[in-house]
A protein has these predicted regions:
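ATP-dependent small-molecule kinase catalytic core of the GHMP/sugar-kinase superfamily
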Residues: 2-16, 22-40, 127-189
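N-terminal beta-alpha supersecondary unit
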Residues: 7-91
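Residue-level signature for short turns and capping positions that connect secondary-structure elements
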Residues: 28, 58, 69, 100-102, ...
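Short clusters of hydrophobic/aromatic residues that line enzyme substrate/ligand-binding pockets
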Residues: 38, 64, 70-71, 103, ...
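Active-site catalytic microenvironments for nucleophilic, acid-base chemistry
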Residues: 84, 88, 120-124, 140
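Short pre-catalytic strand/loop immediately N-terminal to key active-site residues, enriched for Gly-Thr
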Residues: 93-106
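DPxDG-like acidic metal-binding loop motif
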Residues: 105-135, 147
Length: 189
């Protein structure tokens, strides 16, 4: 039995957290709140992380096991997303992340994982928040999270929260990831 089969057999539900490409990025200006207004086209791609989630009743603890040792729990957007969704509920969560999206490659892995956890807890916990409310919640954690909650290729403006769905012709992309990691915050500073 594979690890995936073991997780699914023990009550975990599997979700896919896709990566994205910025087909172009134009930084318009820096805002007073420290964010930047941008224009971009975000394209979802097939590369994805696997997220396994199991909710527990009457236990508010959140446990995350990440296949990447590079992510510190206190910096993990996935943990913050679970906290945000479970804060006023008598639910806890066990989350296992199988990383395939390279960290620091600009592919949105952390934001995608957080968005996936927000949507998964909404579904599994029968919270029934609307997509608009999920997007508002996600924006509190990161500018790319609304895009992943929306789940469609988009023309993006503002800090990333203004989304206009677009059709992009089928294309093939080659993603080359050098042995280099870049923090998004560093790029925009």
């Amino acid at each position: 039995m594979t690890n995936i089969q073991k997780l699914e057999a023990s009550g975990y539900t599997r979700f896919s957290a896709p990566a994205k490409l910025n087909l172009f990025l134009k930084v318009i200006n820096k805002r007073k709140d420290g964010y930047h207004n941008i224009q971009s086209v975000f394209q979802l791609i097939d590369l994805h992380d696997d997220i396994f989630i199991k909710l527990r009743e009457k236990d508010k603890q959140i446990n995350i096991k990440n296949s990447s040792l590079l992510i510190k729990p206190e910096n993990d957007l996935t943990f913050k997303a679970a906290q945000l969704m479970l804060i006023d509920r008598q639910l806890g969560a066990d989350i296992v992340i199988n990383k395939n999206i390279p960290i620091g490659a600009g592919l949105g892995g952390g934001s995608s994982n957080a968005a996936t956890v927000i949507m998964a807890i909404n579904k599994l916990g029968k919270i029934n928040m609307s997509k608009i409310d999920l997007i508002k919640h996600g924006l509190r954690l990161g500018a790319d999270i609304p895009f992943f909650i929306n789940g469609k290729n988009a023309w993006v403006e503002g800090i990333g929260e203004l989304l206009n769905d677009i059709k992009i012709t089928n294309s093939t992309y080659v993603v080359i990831v050098p042995n280099l990691s870049i923090n998004t915050k560093t790029i925009f500073s």
